[in-house]
Amino acid sequence: AVAAESSTGTWTTVWTDGLTSLDRYKGRCYHIEPVAGEDNQWICYVAYPLDLFEEGSVTNMFTSIVGNVFGFKALRALRLEDLRIPPTYSKTFQGPPHGIQVERDKLNKYGRPLLGCTIKPKLGLSAKNYGRACYECLRGGLDFTKDDENVNSQPFMRWRDRFVFCAEAIYKSQAETGEIKGHYLNATAGTCEEMIKRAVFARELGVPIVMHDYLTGGFTANTTLRHYCRDNGLLLHIHRAMHAVIDRQKNHGMHFRVLAKALRMSGGDHIHSGTVVGKLEGEREMTLGFVDLLRDDFIEKDRARGIFFTQDWVSMPGVIPVASGGIHVWHMPALTEIFGDDSVLQFGGGTLGHPWGNAPGQAANRVALEACVQARNEGRDLAREGNEIIRAACKWSPELAAACEVWKAIKFEFEPVDTID
């Protein structure tokens, strides 16, 4: 029923079935296996002919595969765990605007994760105070600051004012530090036309990156913005706001690895991926599975990490995963070990909550990161020696020592809801 409803079938036989080749176009369920440890749950493998899908359209792909079938009365629950995108179809998508290597070349930063910070409070600041917070963070050692996902154009801070003050913060901090800086200017808007207008203004200001909420904004809007960013040299940061409504429950919806694959096809240079160690949901092996699906060219099937199919992206550029949500300096060794160099480690409260202010908060994060990268390059085990490495760095960084004292007892030890088992 699932295969039929998402391809050529309906609830009854219709006379127009005779006007086409149903055998050519229908979806086929080719394998069924029980879910281990569960009664009345099965994993079904369904294959669809490529001719059912419009080239280069994530919107059409999802409309077909996860359309009406999820509302069937006959089904108590239904979840899309994974998709295999054949190279023949993935080559019809242009993917990320630039990709990992081009971004590194634009920023001239290599050999370490990038550092970011979400400006808090996320709502309520005036544009001038918002820009001031960005400046203090960027001059303290950050690579990026960020609009939160729901910062668009509200009465207390209109988008054009925010863009101008953030651009000023970028240029001042670049002049002071000699490093290339950026701020994720959220271009998400109520219409595609308004979204592109905001991206155009960001380009005119000369900033390096804009941002989009790809699930609330929609895949059509996201792909539209991706094309503009590629044509105009802007990096594109993607926030996944609303994803947990879709992916968090184990028995209904779809897994985030599917949304991650869809984003890589639709286009984005960064996407939030969870942290494993922070405040947001995410089991380690499962998170690393879809992080590899975002970054790597070829990923082998590995059910232990939740990867149901071998995926070959051919020449499609990779996406940088962003670890963000409830992280602080004590998490730095684990984050460096888990995510590696091609990642963005984004500290919001873990920067702005520093007792001495924003710039010292960023200095603490930068020192902690540099210490972890140096220790890793020397062959030390970050998982086992992480706390020792951070304590040693505190001896020559009073900013880091103060941060460690503030957050020494902050932990988020909750069992994940969505697990591989």
Curated annotation (Swiss-Prot):
GO biological process, one term: photorespiration
EC number(s) from the headed UniProt entry: 4.1.1.39
Cofactor or coenzyme needed: Mg(2+)
Catalytic activity of the protein: 2 (2R)-3-phosphoglycerate + 2 H(+) = D-ribulose 1,5-bisphosphate + CO2 + H2O; D-ribulose 1,5-bisphosphate + O2 = 2-phosphoglycolate + (2R)-3-phosphoglycerate + 2 H(+)
TM segment ranges: none
Annotated positions binding Mg(2+): K146, D148, E149
Catalytic residues of the enzyme: K120 (proton acceptor), H239 (proton acceptor)
Site keyed Transition state stabilizer: positions: K279
Highest taxon in the source lineage: Eukaryota
Chain positions with N6-carboxylysine modification: K146
GO annotation, cellular component aspect: chloroplast
Keywords assigned: Calvin cycle, Carbon dioxide fixation, Chloroplast, Disulfide bond, Lyase, Magnesium, Metal-binding, Monooxygenase, Oxidoreductase, Photorespiration, Photosynthesis, Plastid
Broad class of the protein's primary localization: plastid
CDD domains named among the record's database cross-references: RuBisCO_large_I (cd08212)
Cofactor note: Binds 1 Mg(2+) ion per subunit.
UniProt-listed Pfam families: RuBisCO_large (PF00016), RuBisCO_large_N (PF02788)
Places the protein is found: Plastid, Chloroplast
Assembly with partners or alone: Heterohexadecamer of 8 large chains and 8 small chains; disulfide-linked. The disulfide link is formed within the large subunit homodimers.
Further facts: The basic functional RuBisCO is composed of a large chain homodimer in a 'head-to-tail' conformation. In form I RuBisCO this homodimer is arranged in a barrel-like tetramer with the small subunits forming a tetrameric 'cap' on each end of the 'barrel'.
Function per UniProt: RuBisCO catalyzes two reactions: the carboxylation of D-ribulose 1,5-bisphosphate, the primary event in carbon dioxide fixation, as well as the oxidative fragmentation of the pentose substrate in the photorespiration process. Both reactions occur simultaneously and in competition at the same active site.
NCBIfam families (UniProt xref): PRK04208.1
Protein's UniProt name: Ribulose bisphosphate carboxylase large chain
Species this chain originates from: Aegilops tauschii
